[in-house]
């Protein structure tokens, strides 16, 4: 389904950019003050790429990017699965019925409270992405250790739940 981009690359894009941007922008100040700046996109017109507040050259310094070739029309379905409101199973059923892959970005507590849904996401071939444990504003994290813990705690419970490493 993800013809031009591997699941691993697709998952790593948001995490890689966020990590690169925050660490790169405030690496020297991570232990003394929260990183300054925030990532965002502006959508000015329909059917045009969004405008980012970091240039392609700035992102390239950290081997990060947010957009690829826009000539090929590819749709990526992503779900911010921060909590379960009773719709995830129905969504998974519809995706399976239509043979469509998607990415579900989950927080740690979601995996804790919905292990069977997470196992099904994995079994059905969807990407399960890391959305941190508590969903904090990562640009405001005061230490590198707390920043990393938000990510590694999710990776750990995902592996305990599914038996697989998070891609």
What are these regions (language model features)?
Residues 30-42:
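Ser/Thr/Pro/Gly-rich low-complexity linker/stalk segments immediately outside membranes or between
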Residues 10, 45-46:
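Generic N-terminal simple sequence motifs
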Residues 2-29:
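Sec-dependent N-terminal signal peptides of Gram-positive bacterial secreted proteins and lipoproteins
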Residues 47-142, 153-157, 162-163:
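Active-site beta->alpha N-cap acidic-glycine motif
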Residues 144-149:
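Non-membrane alpha-helical structural segments and their capping/turn regions in soluble enzymes
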Residues 16-22, 34, 45, 96, ...:
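Generic low-complexity, intrinsically disordered sequence content enriched
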Residues 166-167:
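Cyclophilin-type peptidyl-prolyl cis-trans isomerase
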């Amino acid at each position: 389904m993800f013809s031009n981009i591997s699941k691993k690359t697709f998952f790593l894009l948001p995490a890689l950019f966020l990590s690169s941007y925050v660490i790169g922008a405030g690496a020297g100040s991570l232990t003394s003050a929260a990183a300054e700046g925030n990532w965002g996109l502006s959508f000015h017109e329909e059917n045009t790429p969004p405008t980012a507040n970091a240039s392609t050259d700035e992102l390239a310094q950290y081997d990060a990017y947010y957009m690829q070739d826009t000539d090929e029309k590819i749709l990526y379905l992503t779900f911010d699965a921060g909590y379960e409101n009773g719709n995830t199973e129905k969504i998974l059923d519809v995706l399976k019925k239509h043979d469509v892959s998607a990415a579900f970005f989950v927080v740690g507590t979601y995996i804790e409270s919905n292990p069977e849904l997470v196992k099904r996401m994995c079994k059905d071939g969807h990407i399960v992405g890391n959305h941190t444990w508590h969903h904090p504003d990562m640009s405001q994290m005061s230490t590198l250790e707390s920043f990393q813990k938000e990510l590694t705690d999710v990776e750990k419970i995902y592996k305990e739940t599914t038996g697989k490493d998070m891609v």
